[in-house]
């Protein structure tokens, strides 16, 4: 299916697969030898298969455990920024990095999905959720669900009190089936189709500073949705799969929509 998609879309197709925390822990020999884990082998196999289908791998192997939240499987803003730099380099885009003065930290602790699922019982302390202020992303028009001018960064998610607030939704208010992100004054930039999961959410605001984005999350589109058709309709210049490495569960969905 992926090979057919690469041929049909007739544009460069890239993949940036975030290694899971297990893959990194295994690489850094932090998992005891008596614990059975083949995460790295599976990860390498997946990348091999995607490359065989004609995609270009943008390796994110430089990521460290400190680039991820302790209480969540997602990467934090440092991991997302590192991924953005790798992607822009690999896709020949101009990176636009914020300065340290644009960085903000939520005043409330962030308990990620791993902690919330266990009713916080195992979380000795929460994470600090950092993000870059909305002003840095001014001019990027975000459209989904039939409306535009949506916030790139919605600070209400970091301002709310309560341990069960999903503060990760500060980035684009979470997941949406189809979304576009364009910087109004820049018409000469390439258009990228991004096929993503929630790992992409903190990366997309950065990426929208370098290119116009048409974004699809196949978990939230109708079964009849045709990604190849959508790519042609939007006249995209390239395609980027931006996912975490546990993509196996989505393979069936991709087979139906590509």
Predicted feature locations:
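Extracellular glycan-modifying ectodomains
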Residues: 1-258
């Amino acid at each position: 299916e992926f090979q057919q998609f690469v041929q049909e879309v007739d544009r460069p197709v890239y993949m940036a697969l975030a290694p899971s925390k297990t893959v990194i822990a295994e690489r850094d020999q932090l998992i005891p030898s008596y614990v059975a884990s083949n995460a790295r082998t599976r990860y390498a196999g997946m990348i091999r298969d995607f490359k065989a289908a004609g995609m270009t791998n943008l390796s994110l192997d430089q990521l460290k455990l400190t680039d991820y939240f302790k209480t969540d499987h997602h990467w934090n803003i440092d991991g997302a920024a590192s991924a953005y730099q790798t992607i822009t380099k690999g896709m020949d885009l101009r990176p636009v990095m914020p300065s340290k003065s644009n960085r903000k930290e939520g005043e409330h602790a962030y308990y990620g999905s791993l902690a919330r699922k266990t009713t916080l019982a195992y979380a000795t302390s929460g994470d600090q959720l950092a993000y870059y202020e909305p002003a840095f992303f001014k001019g990027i028009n975000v459209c989904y669900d039939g409306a535009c001018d949506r916030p790139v960064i919605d600070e209400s998610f970091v301002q709310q009190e309560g341990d069960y607030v999903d503060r990760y939704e500060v980035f684009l208010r979470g997941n949406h089936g189809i979304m576009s992100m364009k910087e109004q004054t820049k018409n000469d930039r390439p258009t990228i189709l991004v096929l993503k999961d929630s790992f992409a959410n903190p990366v997309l605001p950065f990426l929208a500073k370098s290119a116009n984005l048409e974004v699809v999350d196949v978990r939230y589109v109708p079964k009849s949705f045709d990604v190849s058709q959508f790519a042609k309709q939007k006249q995209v210049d390239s395609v980027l799969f931006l996912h975490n490495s546990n993509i196996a569960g989505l393979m069936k969905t991709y087979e139906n929509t590509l």
